[in-house]
A protein has these predicted regions:
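Short, structured segments at the rim of ligand-binding sites
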Residues: 1-419
């Protein structure tokens, strides 16, 4: 199993370009099922989760090619198998996203109950209840979801809880349904807006994404499109914190700062100097002046749960005490035990992490437990004294494109160790 070796102490400096957003790309890849015409993606990140979605689509009969411009072209005109098998789904919970598209276009889907991140309960009930309201018949058989419908019919759906993938799945199902669908209590994440933009570029009629209510007027068919994946706000936030914990000065290009206000506001409170110009964000930080900032995660526009672990590291190096509260997922403090081995002073009680800032961290062998926990351990290693070995880095490859290359370019001493 590959590992990352980090020798801490180098201040990061320089400029990097932000990769395309995984959380925007995955539902769009699932939505290619909705059209029999080819779709071309630009700025698609090279990540393990993207590869997994390619494997799922490929197993159904999709044709996926890469052109000379490094753009991916996907054609789902010859799908012959409407099943997402367990051996693929178990590695990525977002596999459930193909459910809505398959039922809408082909009237049937057989999807293994999802696996993926080990960070608590992420129920698929919201997806299934909403699909039933659109007219689908749902059965659970031997660990699989079987959904079928002769034709989906638009209706009003009030989600019983906010779910990003639930919102996205039903958006995809509703674009080919008869009549109008109104979704309420929906996720407002920028990636939901991105999916709406993508679907509309294919000829769908989706309005209201990013607000409390999404309205979808069903159409008979969708056409092909060429679409560029927006920048990954979580990747950008992670690199900004990498600069902050090392007392560095970096610029991230190809990123929309307006999508990151919830992150940037907290970084400013921690003492970071941030300058925004068009699609660039520059961060400068004095490592000796990190201020503690309380964090409470919430659905967008609140502070993103996917940045909680990274900000925990920043708080752990602050001049004071802070509290990080996780309101979105249970069991998402598994990184704390490993961080404490490096010298952090963090106590977890329920959904709260109580943090007392320390002057420095020490390198140590640590083990990653999930994607964002992996990122937090790398951040800790960058600013720690001595050598840190991060094990089980397959987690990091699910969501960060060439992370060791980008960090090395900024001046980090980081090396990928082979199996």
């Amino acid at each position: 199993m590959e590992k990352l070796k980090i020798v801490g102490g180098n201040k990061l400096s320089g400029s990097i370009s932000c990769s395309g957003a995984k959380n925007a790309a995955l539902p769009m890849l699932a939505a290619t099922i909705l059209s029999d015409q080819p779709i071309t993606f630009k700025n698609l990140p090279y990540l393990q989760d993207i590869t997994t979605m390619f494997e799922i689509l490929g197993s159904m009969g999709a044709d996926i090619t890469l052109n000379e411009n490094m753009d991916f072209r996907i054609s789902t005109s010859k799908l012959h198998d409407f099943e997402a098998r367990y051996e693929l789904v178990k590695t990525m919970r977002a596999s459930i996203l193909v459910l809505g598209s398959l039922v809408a276009r082909y009237g049937f889907a057989r999807i293994a109950l999802p696996g993926g991140c080990a960070i608590g309960t992420r129920p698929v009930d919201f997806h299934l209840e909403a699909l039933q309201q659109l007219g689908a018949k749902i059965e659970l058989k031997n660990g699989y979801i079987e959904a079928s419908a002769k034709k989906l019919t638009g209706c009003e759906i009030n989600f019983s809880g906010i779910s990003v993938t639930g919102t996205e799945n039903i958006m995809m199902a509703a674009v080919l349904a008869e009549g109008q669908t109104i979704l309420r209590n929906v996720a407002k994440e920028p990636e939901v807006e991105d999916l709406a933009d993508f679907l509309n570029s294919m000829g769908a009629k989706v309005t209201g994404a990013g607000t409390d209510e999404i309205i979808i007027d069903g159409v008979k068919e969708l056409h092909g499109t060429v679409f560029s994946i927006p920048a990954d706000r979580i990747e950008a936030g992670t690199y900004l914190i990498a600069a902050a914990v090392t007392g560095g000065d970096i610029t991230i290009s190809n990123v929309q700062a307006s999508r990151m206000n919830n992150i940037l506001d907290k970084l400013k409170l921690s003492g970071c100097l941030i300058n925004i110009e068009e699609n660039d964000i520059q961060l400068t930080m004095d490592q000796d002046c990190i201020l503690p900032v309380d964090i409470s995660t919430a659905p967008f526009p609140g502070f993103p749960t996917d940045m909680q672990a990274q900000f925990t590291v920043l708080n752990a190096l602050s001049k004071g005490s802070s509290v990080v509260t996780e309101n979105v997922f249970e069991n998402r403090f598994m990184h704390v035990q490993e961080l404490n081995r490096m010298g952090c002073d963090i106590t977890v009680k329920g959904s709260n992490a109580f943090i007392k800032g320390v002057d420095f961290l020490n390198g140590a062998p640590v083990m990653a437990t999930d994607l964002r926990a992996s990122a937090s351990l790398i951040l800790a290693g960058l600013c720690a004294k001595g050598e840190t070995i991060v094990d089980r880095i397959y987690h990091i490859d699910r969501g960060y494109e060439r992370i060791e290359e980008k960090l090395s370019y900024l001046g980090a001493d980081i090396t990928r160790l082979p199996n």
